[in-house]
From Swiss-Prot:
Name of the protein: tRNA pseudouridine synthase A 2
GO biological process: tRNA pseudouridine synthesis
Binding-site residues, substrate: Y110
Similarity-based family: Belongs to the tRNA pseudouridine synthase TruA family.
Gene transcribed to yield this protein: truA2
Pfam families named among the record's database cross-references: PseudoU_synth_1 (PF01416)
HAMAP family per UniProt: TruA (MF_00171)
Keyword tRNA processing (UniProt): yes
């Protein structure tokens, strides 16, 4: 069988995340339905991660096996003609038979966007997290350095994960500002359940002046979820890139 790799952009607002589930609408379900319409085959598409309800993606990676003779690059147009407008295939290609979108990843980059102004957003309400009080961005940037490297991120994991270890390596974490938007980029070899959202919630405690930057090290060393910040909403989170 042939192995087709897809790079997918999607708006997660209307979906219950990536992974197919009986209770509702998911990205995986929609993509599999589109593949069936194109190939007349029942397939199971393998995704690079399980993004939660409301989370978006610029370059999600998935793959599926098929007996179809459609050229790999042509799946992009074929599937886009069958998909809803909030899910778009931005690239399709045939890859080695042993390629696996999830198990072969070496890392991912996420971005979380905060809108830091008094007025709540109207147009971007599904893509940012609104914080009314002015944040101390410089202190947040200073705090980021404590996340870098290999640590046990047990304090940054919500109940519900099934991983064997909570040790992860954050290879890059930095903050960029665009007007009243604060963008927090986090790259790691892997992520725990809600890890990015908890990192952002903890950085907000620093940004609001409730804690000093060194507080981040205390939370990591404690391994105590209760010491970390809130789990911010999914709306501001976007999967930027998957590495292989």
């Amino acid at each position: 069988m042939r192995n087709i790799k897809l790079t997918i952009e999607y708006d997660g607002t209307s979906y219950f995340g990536w992974q197919k589930q009986p209770i509702g609408n998911t990205i995986q379900q929609k993509v599999e339905e589109a593949i069936k319409k194109v190939t007349k085959e029942e397939v199971e598409i393998l995704g690079s991660s399980r993004t939660d309800s409301g989370v978006h993606a610029k370059a999600y990676v998935a793959n599926f096996k098929t007996n179809s003779n459609i050229p790999g690059k042509n799946f992009k147009a074929a599937l886009n003609s069958k998909l809803p407008k909030d899910i778009v295939i931005i690239n399709s290609e045939e890859v080695a038979e042993d390629f696996h979108a999830r198990y072969m990843t070496t890392g991912k980059t996420y971005c979380y966007t905060i809108l830091n102004r008094e007025e709540p957003p109207a147009l971007e309400r599904n893509y940012v997290y609104h914080v009314k009080k002015q944040l101390d961005v410089e202190s947040m940037k200073e705090a980021c350095k404590y996340f870098l490297g290999k640590h046990d991120f047990k304090a940054f994991q919500r109940p519900g994960g099934t991983v064997k270890t909570s040790v992860r390596t954050i290879t890059d974490i930095h903050i960029e500002t665009e007007g009243n938007k604060i963008k927090i980029y986090v790259s790691a070899d892997g992520f725990l359940y809600n890890m990015v959202r908890l990192i952002v919630g903890t950085l907000l405690k620093v940004g609001r002046g409730k804690e000093k930057p060194e507080y981040i090290k205390e939370v990591i060393d404690s391994g105590d979820r209760k010491k970390a910040g809130i789990c911010v909403p999914p709306t501001g989170l976007c999967l930027e890139k998957v590495f292989y």
